[in-house]
Design a protein with these regions (language model features):
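Sec-dependent bacterial lipoprotein signal peptides
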Residues: 1-19
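Bacterial Sec-dependent N-terminal signal peptides
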Residues: 16-44, 179-182, 190-196
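N-terminal targeting signals for Sec/Tat export/insertion, comprising classic cleavable signal peptides
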Residues: 40-54
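A mature extracytoplasmic/lumenal domain signature
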Residues: 46, 95-97, 107, 150, ...
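Surface-exposed helix/loop patches within compact recognition domains
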Residues: 52-147
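C-terminal or internal capping secondary-structure element at the end of a domain, subdomain, or sheet
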Residues: 142-196
Length: 196
């Protein structure tokens, strides 16, 4: 009888463990940015082509990943502004393509605009487009990995901010594409923090 109670207790404990783990998995977002110990959901992505700068062989592509509280406003098919509140991350990537990201690992290098690098990147938390006074953290090192799953991107990043705090995350989904030629170098989200 004692063995039966122990067996039932073990089965009950194991069931609770499995249900608890499944619940934890269900509550974590599929796309997120993590700063220190705090996790923020990401739900939308933008890919902006700024073409080539100077003598660099690489195209300048900006990737902006945003939380669900933001709405992008367009004018004549180009980004005009952003409204709402939330969090996001921006990568300035040097790539061989102009309309998509290469499947590759991009390494942070603030001194270079070589293929396969990124620089001038930052994460923004608690941004309110009405007050434009976010908590902004410049990225000082790290890696961004780009993969494809069918027609959707899988971006993962593991970086440090200028204070040495970890900024990491994953984004799974599409990136809305905007093409800015030489005449539109100043285009993009006008009221988004810019560290360039």
């Amino acid at each position: 009888m004692k063995n039966l109670y122990q067996l039932l207790f073990c089965v009950f404990a194991f069931t609770l463990l499995i249900v608890g783990c499944k619940k934890d998995r269900d509550n974590s977002p599929g796309s997120y940015i993590k700063h220190g110990d705090v996790v923020y959901e990401l739900s939308q992505g933008i890919l902006e082509n700024y073409g080539k700068y100077g003598t660099s062989e690489a195209n300048n592509l900006d990737v902006i990943l945003l939380s669900p509280g933001f709405k992008i406003h367009e004018s004549n098919g180009q980004i005009d502004s952003i409204s709402g509140m939330g969090n996001g991350i921006h990568f300035e990537i040097h790539d061989s393509s102009f309309d998509k990201l290469d499947i590759d690992d991009y390494i942070y290098n603030n001194e270079s605009e070589q293929l396969g690098t990124f620089n001038h990147s930052s994460a923004v938390f608690n941004y309110d487009s009405r007050s434009e006074n976010p908590q902004e953290f410049e990225i000082s090192s790290g890696k961004l990995t780009v993969k494809m799953n069918g027609s959707e991107y899988e971006l993962s990043f593991d970086c440090l901010d200028s204070d040495g705090k970890i900024i990491s995350g994953v984004y799974k989904g599409s990136l809305k594409y905007y093409n800015y030629d030489d005449a539109l170098k100043s285009a993009g989200i006008k009221n988004w923090p810019d560290i360039r």
